[in-house]
């Protein structure tokens, strides 16, 4: 927090700095502050200022069962070779499934697929129930109606604080130019502006 500029400089400089708490009171885990005077919730809200697309990550587990979850931490790494990345919290129940997966698919959700995003972010027993999909190259489900699909082979995984960062090599992709993407911004869904807006 900047000093109070209404105070005389001499008074401001002679004041002892305000003691900062050693942990974030807003966090049940009591995590330490991410920056001086700022907590992890503030950090999360600031990150929410950056609009992202919404994706559903899918794969098959060791028993051949479909597994999927909503993520927004998707990005490109390289065009040659074609590499993408995404991250997953160490606390995620799906972490081991994706660590062991040799292949997975990234489904880029379209603007009308908010319900699918919510479903794959929920704790329902079968997230695929009522969702149309087809198997990809490796068997990973490709959700119907998406803007784009990236079928990937696991390339590498790196530690990243309280997350793991996964890098995938794209083996096949497809897109639908007629579909606008689903957008997430500031903790809520949004849509792209059109020329009429």
Feature-to-residue mapping (PLM):
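Basic, polyanion-binding surface patches
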Residues: 2-197
